Amino acid sequence: MFARQAIRAAQPLKSQYRRYATESTSGGGSNAALYAGLAAAAGAGAYYFLNQGDNAAKVKDAAKDAEAKAKEAVGQGKSKVEGAVGKAAFTGGDQGFISLKLDSVENINHNTKKFRFELPESDQVSGLQVASALLTKFKGPEMQKPAIRPYTPTSDESEQGFIDLLVKKYPNGVMSEHMHDMVPGQRLDFKGPIPKYPWSANKHDHIALIAGGTGITPMYQLARAIFNNPADKTKVTLVFANVTEEDILLKREFEDLENTYPQRFRAFYVLDNPPKSWSGGKGFVNKELLKTVLPEPKTENVKVFVCGPPGMYKAISGPKVSPSDQGELAGILKELGYSKEQVYKF
């Protein structure tokens, strides 16, 4: 029954999706501001030279002047880039855990909160790359050993002074229950960055993001980085499964991406317990839905990312063996013809 419902929900988008999935992509440069400054300085030197006649000394002076201005422009460009990046709060390696103060808490839905933690200095950035995460650590008074859990911040990597986390409260989840009990002013230990999948612009022509619940956070980190970079022309397809409509996290942000980049970003939502008015997928993510909306495995430079609860991994891609071992590819993606190299499990 769900298979028919899911496909029926996807049909109005199918022809649009296939058109969007086959459009060409192109790359671009990234140091435009720096090069523009350099060109302007060189142009100023050329103007000076052309208005000084044939005097050799003046020609030599003009060359020196142009060189000095070019160096100045490069220096200014570098300082702007470095200033934009800022100092990193998390540097990895032997840094160890850092204690951060909770600045604010916002209720998102019935079981999820947004936590904003202050970085040690107001002009610092997190230091996270795409895609990477942070470890959190907490040890209660009666705990024999600390609880350590990974989280992917939803704040932009360029944001200064804070990080944001979306945390869903799970029954008997030591870390999530502790965080949901925290109030502003309290502190939590963090360590990172923990590298996941190193992303670079146009690394793949098309990526698919298959997420369940709070498994959406690394997917959002990746999608945001792609669309924040004008040089990155990667196409993105999101399949996001949840229990109820209220559980769909970051939906407004994904709708903004879909409205801004309709030829490059599409999102498909699946609910286990949908309302009567729901027109999207119903039940669980299945083979028929993925075959309809995902990019073809043999015709494009594609990568499929999976992040969600254990049941989703088992059905879609097979489980990871450990954080450093992706395990064998299994499940629906293998049945659809994707190779192990085409799939990454967060």
Swiss-Prot record:
One of its GO terms (cellular component) is mitochondrial outer membrane. Its main location: mitochondrion. It is found in: Mitochondrion outer membrane. Its EC number is 1.6.2.2. The chain crosses the membrane at residues 28-50. Its cofactor is FAD. It is a single-pass membrane protein. It comes from the Eukaryota. One of its GO terms (molecular function) is cytochrome-b5 reductase activity, acting on NAD(P)H. FAD binds at residues 203-238. Keywords: FAD, Flavoprotein, Membrane, Mitochondrion, Mitochondrion outer membrane, NAD, Oxidoreductase, Transmembrane, Transmembrane helix. InterPro entries: CBR-like, Cbr1-like_FAD-bd_dom, FAD-bd_FR_type, Flavoprot_Pyr_Nucl_cyt_Rdtase, FNR_nucleotide-bd, OxRdtase_FAD/NAD-bd, Riboflavin_synthase-like_b-brl. It catalyses: 2 Fe(III)-[cytochrome b5] + NADH = 2 Fe(II)-[cytochrome b5] + NAD(+) + H(+). GO terms for biological process: ergosterol biosynthetic process. Pfam families: FAD_binding_6, NAD_binding_1. The keyword Cell division does not apply. Gene3D superfamilies: Nucleotide-binding domain of ferredoxin-NADP reductase (FNR) module, Translation factors. The keyword Transmembrane applies. Residues 95-200 form the FAD-binding FR-type domain. Belongs to the flavoprotein pyridine nucleotide cytochrome reductase family. May mediate the reduction of outer membrane cytochrome b5. This is NADH-cytochrome b5 reductase 2. It comes from Botryotinia fuckeliana (strain B05.10). The gene is mcr1.
